[in-house]
Amino acid sequence: MNFNSSVVTLFEVSWEVCNKVGGIHSVVTSKALQAVEHFGEDYFLLGPALKNNPGFEETDEHAWDSLRMGLATRDLKCRLGRWNIPGRPKVILVEFDKRYSSNQLLFEMWKNYGVDSLSGGWDYIEPVMFATACGEVIAAIHESRVEPMQGRSVALFHEWMCGAGLLTVKKLTPEVGTVFTTHATTLGRAMAGTGRDIYTNMRNIHPANEAAALNITAKWSIESAAAREADAFTTVSPITGEESTVFLGRQPDVITTNGLDLRVIPDYTEDRAVPSATRTRIMATASRFLRGSLPEHTRIFAISGRYEMHNKGVDIFLEALARADRNLAGTNSSILALCLVMGGHTGVNAAAVSGNPDDTDNGLPFICTHRVWNAPQDPIINACRRLGLDNRAERRVKIIFVPAMLDGHDGFFDIPYEEVLAACDMGFFPSWYEPWGYTPQESAAWAVPTLTTDLSGFGMWAREQMKEESMDRTGVCVMPRRGMSFDQSVDRLHERVLGAAACPDG
C-alpha cells in the first residue's frame, strides 16, 4: 500500500457530540468546518444516542448505505445523520445501553489492559459502554468501507470517557491509528477541587495513592491505560502536559492548543448594534427579576463554565463582588453579575421570574432563576447569602444565577450563550484549575474584555503572545494565581472588579 497517496478516514469520538456538557463540545464544534474541508466525506463524528441530541438531523444519504451493511453484520444499532453546525459534519450516534454485560466488559478491560474498574459507579460504567460500542463501530466501518478501498483509518478519542473505545479499536483492528486527547486529568481536577496546589510539588505526588484517596481509581486507571496504549497522545496545553507526564505516566507527543474558527464568529469590535440590542433585552429581563430598574450605566459582568466552585474561581469571584459591593456603597455605581454556571434543575422558577414584588424566596429577593436540585445545599446560592449578595434594593452589586444551558430556550433570557456574552462589559474567569479555558477565549473572540489566570492554559498562551506591559490594552488580563493564597487572589480580583466597574463608556 502507498501510504502517502491512500485516503485517510478520520473518526472522532466524544461524549459531547450533539450533547453539550462542557468545553469539549466547543473543541469539537469549533473545528468541525475545517475537518470537513480537509477530510470531506471521510470525516465521522461519533457520539451517544440519547433521548435528546440537540442539532442532530437524521439523514437518508447514499453514503450511509455501505455503512449500514457493515454495522448490521455486528448488530450495531446507530442513528446516522448530520450535525447542524458549521460544516454539517456526518454524525453516527451510537446505541449502547443494552449491548453489554457491564461485569464482563470491565473484566475484559482488566484482563487485556489492566484497567482497575472495581470502584467505578454508573458515571464510569455508562461512558465505558458507550466508548466500547464506538470502538466496535469504528472497527466495523474500517473493515467494510475503508480497508477494501486500501485506505487508512485514524480514530481520535477525547478524554477518559472515551478511553475504552481506544482500547477496543486496538484489540479489534490494531491497524487503525489511535489518538488519545486529554483535556484535563481526572486526578488533577479532583485534587485541585479540594484546594490543593498541585503544581508546586507535582513530582512528589503518588498518582495511584491519591486516586484511591479521592475514590477515582477507575477513571484514573482507564485514562492512564488509554494514554499508554494510544499510538499518539496529545493534550491541550503545556501545563496539562506536565500533569499528564506525572499522573498518567506518559509525556504528550503533541500539544494541541484549542482554537476558535473566527470565520463563524461575528466581528463585534466596531459594529455593536447586535450586542447593544441584546443588552437592552438582558437589562429588561434582569430588572424584572430584581423587581427594580437597573441604571443605564450598569456594568454587566459574567462568569461561566463547569459547576466547580473552587476550580473555576467562582468562590473568589463572589468574594470579590461582595467586597466591591461594600466599597461602592453610597455611590451611583451599579454592577450586574451573571453567574452562567450550568447545574441540575427542574425548570424555571415561575415565582422568581414573575416580576411580582410579593413573590419572594422565603422573604428574601431571589438569586436563582431556576429550581435547582437541593437548593438549601447549593454552593453558589449559599455563598451569595453568606456574603450578603442578596439583591436587596440598596446593593450596588446585583447577582443573577442562571443554572440552565443558554441555548435560546432556557426560560429566562431565551438568548443563546454567545449572544448573552457579547452583550456583557467583561468576562471574569479567575480559574484555579483550567487546562485550557475556552470561556475566556470565547469572551475575547466575541469582543468582550476578559480576565483569565496564569493557571489557565489559555492564560499562559495569551501571556506568551503579549508583552507584559501591554497586556491590559489587549482586552485579555492574565491575573496571577500561581503560588498565591485565597485571600491574595480575592484582593487581586477585587481590584480588577472595581477597575472594570469604573471604566468609561465606549
Feature names for model-found ranges:
Residues 1-506:
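Catalytic cores of nucleotide-sugar-dependent glycosyltransferases that transfer UDP/GDP/TDP-activated
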